[in-house]
């Protein structure tokens, strides 16, 4: 009786493990996918920094989301507003890109530093992190959803 329970338990564990491995294998990215996704990140930065609102919006799916901007038109409007206010003198720098496969496409995380070139010498304007949902479309990889979380400096320590 105990042997049957053990064998049944072992069979369930093996089945679940196999299903997990199958899901991992189906969620994989090729070397070309990684290159294409890195290129998407670069296109995003170059477009927003150059004031190319349509090029910037084209890095998203038509129903894409950037923070609270939903859809192509809202993303174009955001890009135009950003560039009119800050964009002419700031540049986006990304580092530590991490791309992970998902059954739907991929997730991405990357650090963002905005450098203000309107000051002499150039200064760090702000820093943040992006969290992304990416999908592969007929036009290539696109952002489905992109959220930004700004870095917050710790509160100063009280004098002792």
Whereabouts are the PLM-identified features?
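N-terminal secretory signal peptides that target proteins for export/translocation
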Residues: 1-4
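Bacterial N-terminal signal peptides
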Residues: 8-18
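Short, low-complexity N-terminal intrinsically disordered segments enriched in polar/charged residues
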Residues: 21-50, 54-62, 73-74
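Short structured motifs
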Residues: 41, 92-97, 129-130
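Short beta-strand segments enriched in hydrophobic/aromatic residues
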Residues: 48, 60, 112-114, 147-150
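A solvent-exposed, acidic/Ser-Thr-rich amphipathic alpha-helical stretch
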Residues: 53-114
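Short, cysteine-centered beta-strand-loop-beta hairpins and adjacent loop/turn segments enriched
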Residues: 87, 115-124, 153-154
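Short beta-strand edge/turn micro-motifs at domain boundaries
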Residues: 107-109, 127-157
């Amino acid at each position: 009786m105990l042997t049957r329970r053990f064998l049944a338990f072992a069979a369930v564990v093996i089945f679940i493990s196999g299903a997990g491995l199958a899901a991992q294998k189906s969620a994989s990215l090729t070397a070309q996918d990684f290159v294409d996704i890195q290129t998407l990140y670069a296109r995003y930065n170059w477009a927003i920094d150059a004031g190319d609102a349509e090029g910037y919006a084209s890095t998203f799916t038509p129903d894409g989301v950037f923070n609270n901007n939903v859809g192509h038109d809202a993303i174009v409007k955001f890009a135009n507003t950003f560039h009119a206010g800050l964009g002419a003198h700031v540049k986006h720098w990304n580092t530590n890109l991490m791309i992970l496969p998902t059954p739907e496409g991929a997730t991405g995380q990357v650090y963002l530093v905005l450098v203000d070139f309107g000051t002499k010498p150039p200064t760090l304007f702000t820093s943040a992190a992006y969290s992304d949902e990416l999908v592969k479309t007929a036009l290539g990889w696109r952002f489905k959803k992109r959220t930004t979380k700004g870095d917050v400096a710790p509160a100063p320590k009280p004098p002792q």
